[in-house]
A protein has these predicted regions:
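Conserved G/P- and acidic residue-centered "switch" motifs that form tight phosphate/ATP-binding loops
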Residues: 49
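ATP/NTP-dependent adenylation/nucleotidyl-transfer catalytic domains that generate, transfer
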Residues: 2-44, 54, 58-61, 66-72, ...
């Protein structure tokens, strides 16, 4: 595994986090979610990228590495370096792992009748194939699927519905990509993983930033202003950002709202699940309250 030059983790003041506090909060969150659901183990798809690597480290710290199953799910065109990075994480943490090649699943669907499918369509199918593998393994492993999506991708909709966005709970969903890098450095995630260009590895040479057309460093600062500070587009532009980019990010957030919500239900009866029949996950046993 080739180690790139160390990147800078100097974040704008508004994005810098207390990594010690974040580790404590996330560790408590993981343990609480498992306790409420009556489980003691988790599993995740380990791609070799920074997001899943960080979640593996956080989960191993919270409940012990032997309670964390890392599932490696390459496709035939996946980067060998990504698999090597994932194997490095497994070796350093000492957690159990499984290797499931999804090529037969994906190719069995697209060939021979759908060979003209666009890369994005194939990529979405691959993400959902990995979700199926994870949830099947959750039965044999006896654990909950833990999410690996970050706040940046969730807000701009850069995820596959019922694919990489599917999980029982997500410990890093409120961390922007810039903050993921900061926390990963504090956790001891391998430098090669932190420094490499983010990629969903959906097709050869694919990178996240090239696909969306902007850098995480810039979009995180815009999202923080639009979402966390609730600034208007004009106010964000006044902070020095290009209006065209701010407008585009705002449209992406608004246009992907459906990905962040459960499917709407047509209300017919007096109490409707998800509307006026709502409980925390650890709800009282009575349905009459």
């Amino acid at each position: 595994m080739t180690t790139p030059a160390p990147p800078s983790f100097e974040l704008p003041e508004e994005l810098a986090i207390d990594t010690t506090a974040a580790r404590r909060i996330i560790g408590e969150f993981i343990r609480a979610q498992l306790s409420q659901a009556g489980f003691g183990k988790v599993l995740l798809g380990l791609s070799g990228g920074i997001d899943s690597a960080l979640v593996a480290y956080l989960a191993a710290e919270a409940i012990g590495p032997q309670q964390v199953l890392a599932v490696l799910m390459p496709y035939r065109t996946s980067s060998p370096e990504s698999r090597a990075d994932a194997e490095t994480v497994v070796a350093e943490l000492g957690c159990p792992s499984e290797l499931v090649d999804i090529s037969a699943i994906v190719d069995g669907y697209f060939e021979p009748d759908r060979t003209d499918a666009a890369p994005l369509r194939r990529g979405n199918f691959m993400a959902r194939a990995r979700m199926m593998v994870l949830y099947d393994h959750s039965v044999t492993w006896g654990g909950l699927v833990i999410g690996t999506g970050n706040k940046t991708e969730t807000l701009i909709g850069y995820s596959t519905l019922w694919g990489d966005s599917a999980s029982a709970f997500n410990p890093i969903g409120d961390l922007y990509k810039s903050q993921i890098r900061q926390l990963s450095a504090a956790m001891g995630v391998p430098q090669a993983i932190i420094a490499k260009a983010p990629s969903a590895d959906l097709w050869p040479g694919q990178t996240d930033e090239a696909e969306v057309g902007f850098s995480y460093a810039e979009v995180d600062r815009i999202l923080f202003r639009l979402v966390d500070r609730r600034l208007s587009i004009d106010e964000v532009v006044a902070d020095g950002f290009e209006r065209e980019l701010v407008d585009r990010v705002d449209r992406m957030v608004a246009g992907s709202e459906f990905k962040r919500q459960v499917p709407p239900i047509a209300k017919i009866g007096p109490r409707t699940a998800g509307i006026d029949y709502l409980y925390p996950r650890r709800r009282p046993r009575s349905t009459r309250d």
